[in-house]
Each structure stands twice: as structure tokens, then as C-alpha cells.
């Protein structure tokens, strides 16, 4: 991609039209002009009185390198010869009030390591990618009908060196990727990697949207990390925050002394909960900045998806007591998704949205927002409230576990067990579970069993896979020493077996977004807090029966209605001794009794373990999908909710 001489750009292309390559105009680009090598600096500051480029190269002297205003709408530019890569710089902006303020470059692709705040000249081009095979394989699959298991992580606290320092992007490739491959995750989702000044914002309060944070290395180092992920078949999703940004003095806030990237109206500009300000999504230059940024990460870093943060905050004006929709945000999100999918139709655009806004994952031409996935925040909140309740009282909130199936097919959902629920005093997943030490592990195994068998793609925050006891501590790494304890090793083994079972079992993901993929067997047994259901694949013989017991009681010879196959095998039981359970399992082949039960043609009698999940698979006859009498087996469906895509 070539740098565009801003003097040749029609002003309408950036100021009034859709222009999604603005990173080719703005920022610091190493170029040769009039046979001299140097750097061209270009910036948009519509209300600046004067502009200069300052840095070590001119001893930060505002008078030496004055910029030229090349459009009436406030594009400023300057070519400075003999400046090389890794030079640090800022823009010195004289405001209309006569003050001079120093700002980092909004389009800089590299920055100093915090606490320093200057931008750094860096040639983003030149990395040689080796992921063509990944791209080809990705295009051959439909993400909607594939298994998806996402490992959410915070780069700075997954693991640290013995001296407490951070692993670099390249070192994380060596440490993290084998771990992710071992656990058979299909994707990793990384909390924001844009440049940000404050570690404890976790990257959600950014200053440099085009700069991969220098905490972990250079942009090329991050490209290497993504390249290695693709080499081993792992997709990379980034958290991306197009709704709001931080108010640090060197960043976008009041960039030229006036609201430039943010709304002018104080009532909607400020975001008091987070101490940030909201992007003015009705301004064409801001839209071009953000959509260009999304495409920049796709094109230069080969990212496979974005989890778009805080969509609810964008969809509604944040005036106190007001729930009026923000039409600027609605049209921006539609424009964003159209641009992204025009670039890559296989991309993952996931909305983190806690509202009931309709058609979030419907195409824009059907009136939707155009995402292809949405976090199911309602499922997460309901299920965790249910699990935190004492088992003997769960029967009174039985609907917490069934309600999600009333809307499971209204959107394309990802089920998140995310970082939001294991921080700020909310406890870890393991420690949310009531009861004694054994009870906690048994119920977490049960939760994971329900999680992997419920319709929807899967996301788990780091540490959950081995039962992190403490909630997430963002300044420390995970408690890897817990592997010294038997129950945590059991938990880890169980999780790896569960995810492997999920990936090889088509009924658990093939019809995730179709109501034909799920059928309740018994959703109404609140007295015993037992749930049973069927997951169905494309083929009628691809069916699994799932039974979940959310109390500590054990049940012998418990009747469960099943589709009319002759035999069933238990393929997973969370109470197996090898997972730390009590060993109440169904070892023998289960013969289906040809008597209707639970609105099914037959039933089996099984042992239901305490706090246990049991997964049963029908045993196929020699003729595959046919029973011994020659008739085809059918799974009844009583679900009428509509599916999408």
C-alpha cells in the first residue's frame, strides 16, 4: 500500500465521503521526495491555529518544523528530510486560545513504552507472511457450522517471567501457542492490544488505535505472533473499542484544543462510569478514522475477528435516565460491518451487547446491525446466578436455566464465561460454587458440561480451564502452581477431555444456530433440579442425550426419555474418578426400553451422579442410521424458535 500525497487528495474523500485507507494519508510515513529520504507527517486538526512536528531531532523546538495546512478542513502536513526509523515525535498544536499542547500522533503505528508517551516513526511494511494455508483452510469452512472454542486472555497477566517482567510477543508465541493447541481451542481472544497508558485499564482506554502496544515489542513482533498462531491452526480475535477513549492529555481528547474525535455536547461526550469520552460517531472524519483502523488491523496484522466492546454504550445515549437510541452509532455499526465483510466475508464480528436490541447478528440488508456473532450476556448472568445459589434453593429459580432457550436462535450467540465475571470481587468461577471443597469442583465440572452442550459457540477466560481459585489479578500471572494440587489436575484433565469431546461431536455444534439442533427432554423437573435434552447434528443418527443434575443427590435407575435407538453408551460422566468425582458412572451399555417417556419413543434407566453431567450417545447398528427393523430413527423436534443464517 503506497503513501498518498495528501496535497493530491480531494478533501471530500476524507471529510465527506467513505474513505477507509486514511492510514495511508495520515501518520508518519518514510518516503523519498525530491530525491531526499525522510518522513512525511500528516495530521487532521480542524481547529488548530498552527501546527509543528517536534522531537529529539529538533530538541522539541516548536519553531523549527512548522506544518502546512493543506485543506480548509484542517489537514496539516510536512516533509522532514533525513529523519529515520525509530525517531520519536509529537505534534505541537497551537490552539485558538493561544496555548501550545503536545499530542501523540493518532495514526502512529508505534509508540514509546509507557510511561513515556511519544509516537515513534516505524515502517509498518515489510513483514513476510507465511499464512496462506491458513487463509485457504478458513475459506473452505463455514464458521456457523463448525466447532468454536475461544480462549480469552489478557496478554500481560497470562504468564510472567520469574523476575515479574512481561513476555514479548515473540516469547508469547513460544509459551502460549503450544498450550492453546494442547487444549484444542480454535481461537484466542486477546484483550485490547492498542497503545494505552494505564496498565489497569486492560487496554480498553486507548490512546493509539493504530499502534500495537510497545509493552510487548514491535508491530512486526505481533505480526510474527499472529503468523505463528495461524501456522498451528489458531484464529486470532482482538478486543476493539470503537465507542470511547481515554482522556489522557497526550491522546485524542480535545486533540486541537476543542472536541475533535469526541462529541461536542458534554451530556453525551462524557462517560462517567469509565472516566472516558465517547467518539462522535456522526462525524465523517471519525468514522473514517475508526473503520480505516479496523481494516488496518485486518490487512496488516491478519486478524481473524474483533470482539467489539461496549456496544450497549454505543447504541444508547448515556444521558442519565434516558434510553434514546443513538442513530449515529446504529448507522456507524452497520457501515463498519459492511466494510469489514466486504474485505473478508469469513471474518468474525462479535458484539459485546447486554441489551435486547433486535437483529444484532442479522445482515444490514435485513435491517440488522450486521454482526455475525453476539455474546450471550443474558445466558451468562442467569447461569452464574443459578450456580451461586445454594443447591437446595435452585428449584425456586429453575427458569434461570431454561429461559435462554426461548431466545437462543434469535441471534448467533457465543456463550461467554469471560473476564468480566471473575474480577472486582465477583470471585473466580470455582469460588462462585457453593459448598465444600469437593462440591466446588464437582459443580464447576457440571457447569462446564452444561456450557459445552448448550447451543452456542464457546468462550472461556484464562485460568478457568484448571480451576483458578482466586479471581483474576491483572497485575499478577495465573496461579500455575495450582497444578501441584490433585483436584486442579483432575479439573484440567476433565476440561481437556470435555473440549476434545465437544470438537469431535457434531451434534454439539453443527446446528448451533438452528432450532433443529436442540430439544428438551425434560425442562420442568425443578423439584430435583435435573435437566435433560437432546443435541442434534445434520444427520438423524448424530444425536446426543445430555442429563444434568444440579443437586448433590444421587439417583439410581432414573428414567430418561430418549430417541428410538436400541442402545446407548455413556461417553462422558463428570463424576468419574479420573476427574475427581465419586465414581457414580454408567459403565455398561444402556439398552433402550421401548416404552414412551418424556415425549420420546423410548427411555433408558441410568445412574445420575451428584452434581453430575452425563452424556449419552446412541450405538449405531451395522446399517448406520437404521434400527434393526429397518425403519429410520427420527428425533422429534418441539422447538419452534426461528434460527438465523
Curated annotation (Swiss-Prot):
SMART domains xref list: Aamy (SM00642)
Location of the region described as Disordered in the Swiss-Prot/TrEMBL record: 619-645
Active site positions: 309 (nucleophile), 352 (proton donor)
One GO molecular-function entry: cation binding
Reaction(s) the record says it catalyses: Transfers a segment of a (1->4)-alpha-D-glucan chain to a primary hydroxy group in a similar glucan chain
Coiled-coil region(s): none
Transferase recorded as keyword: yes
Sorted UniProt keywords: Carbohydrate metabolism, Glycogen biosynthesis, Glycogen metabolism, Glycosyltransferase, Transferase
Amino acid composition bias (Polar residues), ranges on this chain: 636-645
EC annotation from Swiss-Prot or TrEMBL: 2.4.1.18
Entry keyword annotation includes Transferase: yes
Top-level lineage group: Bacteria
GO BP annotations listed: glycogen biosynthetic process
Gene3D superfamilies referenced in this protein's UniProt entry, alphabetically: Glycosidases (3.20.20.80), Golgi alpha-mannosidase II (2.60.40.1180), Immunoglobulins (2.60.40.10)
Quaternary organization: Monomer.
Family that this chain belongs to: Belongs to the glycosyl hydrolase 13 family. GlgB subfamily.
Protein name as annotated: 1,4-alpha-glucan branching enzyme GlgB
Organism of provenance: Bacillus cereus (strain Q1)
Gene transcribed to yield this protein: glgB
